[in-house]
Every structure is written in C-alpha cells, then in structure tokens.
Regions:
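Substrate-binding/active-site clefts of carbohydrate-active enzymes
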Residues: 3-26, 33-37, 42-171
Length: 171
C-alpha cells in the first residue's frame, strides 16, 4: 500500500462566507495534481450560530439543510454544496475525513429545571454538598428539522454536566 498525503483543508479563522465547500470542490483537480490523496474537513453540521466553526454543536443531523439558529447554511455552505464537493473529490481519487465532535452540545432551544450537585473543579468525580435545583440550557427540540432523520430530543437527563445555572450564573 502506498503512503498517502492528507491535507487539513481548514483553519480556525476561515471567513463566515459559506464558500468553503465550493472552494474545495473547485480545488479538487489541483489537489489531485499535487499528490493530495485525502482532505480533512471541519465539522459539517449546524453549530449554535452560523459563524460557529462546528465545535459548538447544535444539530448533528443538519448539514446546512434546515432553517435553524437563524440560518440554513453552516459557516462552510449548504448540504447540497457539501455533497457536490465530496463527489468532486472522489472523482479526483481524494478521500474525505470529517472532523466531528459527538459529545458537545450548544445553543439549546430552551431551559429546563433539574437537580444538580456541585463538583470539585479540580477533581470532577468529587461531589460537593447536596443536590439542589438549577436551571440550564439543556432542551433541544430542533424545530427547523422536526423529526427528519431522527426524532431524538435532548433533555437535562442526557447530560452528565453543564456549564452554569442560568438563574444564579453560578458555574
């Protein structure tokens, strides 16, 4: 088996212009000519806002297809553009690796009240004090997507930790 060459085709400060998928599609033949055999692309799913790089994950099933969080496209483009880019890369014998963060959630649709217990910030397995009621951004119902692809909705009981109590601001 021949050793391949993979290129990371993104960096943190890309413009929020929705053009990355188009640029990569247009660059596919050039990448093939210079010996690139695979590209690593940023998270393709909807973040908590359009400018999100994909690490503030809102909806893993929305690749730029649904009107959610004030936008249809992601920072990088639409689902259609993503599919066309992948097809063009494959035509040029270039593999595609997606960066994905499956355990991040951001931009919940609503808050929920639930019992929580404070933990030691230096040793998160050490619980401090008794459980008490807090309110957190933990409700995700994906109104723009509805139940397409999945009917799963996130609630407080799906999380093992949150950032803060929205009522008190305590972290």
């Amino acid at each position: 088996m021949e050793n391949g060459v993979m290129m990371q085709y993104f960096e943190w400060n890309l413009p929020n212009d929705g053009m990355l998928w188009k640029r990569l599609k247009d660059d596919a033949s050039h990448l093939h000519e210079i010996g690139i055999s695979a590209v690593w692309i940023p998270p393709a799913y909807k973040g908590h806002e359009q400018a999100d790089e994909g690490y503030g994950t809102y909806d893993l099933y929305d690749l730029g297809e649904f009107d959610q969080k004030g936008t249809i496209r992601t920072k990088y483009g639409t689902k259609q553009e993503l599919q066309e880019m992948i097809e063009e890369l494959h035509r040029n014998q270039i593999g595609v690796y997606l960066d994905a963060v499956m355990n991040h959630k951001a931009g919940a649709d609503y808050t929920e009240k639930f019992m929580a217990r404070e933990v030691n910030p230096d040793q998160r397995t050490e619980q401090l004090g008794e459980p008490y009621e807090i309110e957190g951004w933990t409700g995700f119902n994906f109104p723009g997507r509805g139940n397409k692809y999945s009917d799963f909705k996130w609630h407080w009981y799906h999380f093992s930790g949150i950032d803060c109590d929205v009522v008190t601001g305590k972290k």
